[in-house]
A protein has these predicted regions:
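ASCE RecA-like P-loop NTPase motor cores
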Residues: 1-155
């Protein structure tokens, strides 16, 4: 059985339809799904994402779990809409070792959210959400847009 066949099987499941309908209700803002193990969670999530233009935020238990979930989602849906929002720290916040690559990933997620792109899927974990981020206004005021071939004075 291929990934596409599995995805179609999950997409037709009555629980996906029921949850999709529930997500359409304005009063519902947060949903916890339990009982989905291994790659079943990402297949279920991909079926939901395919049916809705709204952004989704999937909060997993820790970095490792989020990494596996992110990988599974990208295998099913591709990498264009799936974003990973990691902690900006290499190890734990208490050690204070920033990771430049993770800071770039965080900035990309915030930037694409600010643009209002439809159908985004953000995968993260509690440690990453605990960090402060700049406000939308501050990000907008401090964003410098450059074009290919443009000269910039760094002095």
């Amino acid at each position: 059985m291929t990934i596409t066949e599995l995805q179609h099987q999950y997409a037709g499941h009555p629980n996906v339809e029921a949850l999709n309908k529930l997500l359409g209700e304005p009063a519902v803002r947060h949903i916890y799904c339990g009982g989905l193990y291994a790659s079943a969670a990402s297949l279920f999530a991909s079926a939901l994402v395919e049916k809705s233009p709204c952004p989704f935020v999937f909060i997993l238990g820790d970095l490792e779990e989020a990494g596996y979930f992110y990988h599974d989602l990208t295998q099913v849906l591709g990498t264009e809409r799936i974003l990973f929002f990691p902690s900006s720290f290499r190890r734990s916040v208490k050690y204070g070792q920033k990771d430049a690559a993770n800071e770039i990933l965080r900035t990309e997620v915030l930037s694409r959210l600010q643009k209002g792109e439809e159908g985004l899927c953000i995968v993260t974990y509690p440690d990453a959400l605990a960090e402060k981020v700049v406000s939308r206004q501050e990000l907008s005021e401090n964003t410098l847009k450059l074009h290919v071939g443009e000269r910039v004075d760094t002095g």
